[in-house]
Amino acid sequence: MEIQFSYESQDHHFLSDGETKIKIGEPATEEEMTGKIGTVTEESGSLEEDVPHDSRGKEFREFGEELNDQMLFRRRQYNCDECDQSFAWSTGLIRHQRTHWKPYECEECGKAFRMSSALVLHQRIHTGEKPYPCSWCIKSFSRSSDLIKHQRVHTGEKPYKCDECGKAFSQSSDLMIHQRIHTGEKPYQCSHCSKSFSQHSGMVKHLRIHTGEKPYMCNHCYKHFSQSSDLIKHQRIHTGEKPYKCDVCGKAFSQSSDRILHQRIHTGEKPYPCAQCNKSFSQNSDLIKHRRIHTGEKPYKCSECGKAFNQSSVLILHQRIHTGEKPYPCNQCTKSFSRLSDLINHQRIHTGEKPYPCSQCSKMFSRRSDLVKHYRIHTGEKPYECDKCGKTFSQSSNLILHQRIHTGEKPYPCNSCSKSFSRGSDLIKHQRVHTGEKPYTCNLCSKSFSQSSDLTKHQRVHSGEKPYHCSSCNKAFRQSSDLILHHRVHTGERPYACTQCPRSFSQKSDLIKHQRIHTGEKPYKCMCGKAFSQCSAFTLHQRIHTGEKPYPCAQCGKSFSQRSDLVNHQRVHADQKLQM
């Protein structure tokens, strides 16, 4: 018996004995199989129906063995020219060969594909064709698989469940990514550094840090972004879109992450606890910043002056001291600011808005930070401690200023003279000595002041307000500094000692005046050449030149240049009354 292969097409192979064919890869019909066995028995010299059962089985087995031999031989006929892999069928070889070449090319962009189906899907990018519409909403999709995934948004179906924690997902890819949380698997490694990622998209985004690639451009301002999600968020600045609304207070946000953080104000949730102390935070970024208080880490260094910071945002703000950049202008006046928060706070001067009320008293504040600071008056909390002397403070800024007493640091130099200051606010106040600027004007008498605190004190002259009361004698004062000085009358405290003699003073200004006796310094000089050690003496002397007599007598109208002269004069009227 001789069985041979014959071919009718590239993809269909037949076994043949010259008369009957059996198609390989498909079940043979009963007629074909009977005919094939019949042919074998005819060649052996007897008819099929006369062959005993055992003999027929033997013939069939022999036929099967020869078939297997022929098929093994046939498998060796489909070899890949590129890599020497062998295939049983030509279709397998054809599919394999497409791993070496891509025969289906897009006429629009030249991109090539291994499969015609992949080309069809790709061409829909150019044509915009989306033949799979959702029956629930107006969305359409270019692939049926995308439609199936989308429909789970409407049905809520989550057929892919995690065996570890029971969490369910609408897509198998999401489950696979989630499972890497449990396994710790990070199969996508950066070729530039040692970082690995659980998602391919995470690695692609990370690679743009190294390459600097920003493929997503805003068509309003031409700003570029490394991630499409960042572009979408940015575009909401132009459109004003705020699609994420708080269901408690109705406040809307341009980003879902901002809404999540906002909702924690209502819930009080602080899911990020510090392992070093008992503080918790509503944001992970706040916890990371807070930890640096414990570790002392300051990873952000200024390239201009070498100063280091524990937050990148603080470094950016600091660098604007060097550059002078003030990118936030006020649309109500000519002022500009280096920080957005400073602009927002400033604009409340124009609007009068005070959105932060104290729950303990009736006070309201234009800044949240001012409310937090104020609230510590009620609680007595002083969370910031000096590691040099143990003194505690209710505000971190006060601790920083205090620490400069120990370090002697004065980081704010005046560019008009040689003076330096430990506080930026002190430098600003000092610079007004050089510029003569007096930006704070009284709305009752139009008098102007270089400092807001001086205006506040002055306005109490008009209002008669004396908010600072002495606990010993109930005397009231307009200024807290006056109350402190007054307290020393009761306590006898004289904290300012002269280094040249044993005298002490209750006021620093009195010590400075006294020290001029020892040094001979007379800093107040008149145009006539005469000099004085005290400002008050200089003022009195100038009245000789100006003729000013600001102290009039209420009885006779006579005026005097000195108050003491008026007091002496008034005694004349008092004596006259006694004589009468």
Curated annotation (Swiss-Prot):
Selectively expressed in adult testis. PROSITE patterns: ZINC_FINGER_C2H2_1, ZINC_FINGER_C2H2_2. The keyword Nucleotidyltransferase does not apply. GO terms for cellular component: nucleus. GO terms for molecular function: DNA binding; zinc ion binding. InterPro entries: C2H2-ZF_domain-containing, Znf_C2H2_sf, Znf_C2H2_type. It is found in: Nucleus. Keywords: Activator, Developmental protein, Differentiation, DNA-binding, Metal-binding, Nucleus, Repeat, Spermatogenesis, Transcription, Transcription regulation, Zinc, Zinc-finger. The keyword Zinc-finger applies. A zinc finger (C2H2-type) spans 78-100, 104-126, 132-154, 160-182, 188-210, 216-238, 244-266, 272-294, 300-322, 328-350, 356-378, 384-406, 412-434, 440-462, 468-490, 496-518, 524-545, 551-573. GO terms for biological process: cell differentiation; inflammatory response to antigenic stimulus; negative regulation of T-helper 2 cell differentiation; negative regulation of type 2 immune response; spermatogenesis. Belongs to the krueppel C2H2-type zinc-finger protein family. May act to control gene activity during the pachytene stage of meiotic prophase. May function as a transcription activator. This is Zinc finger protein 271. The gene is Znf271.
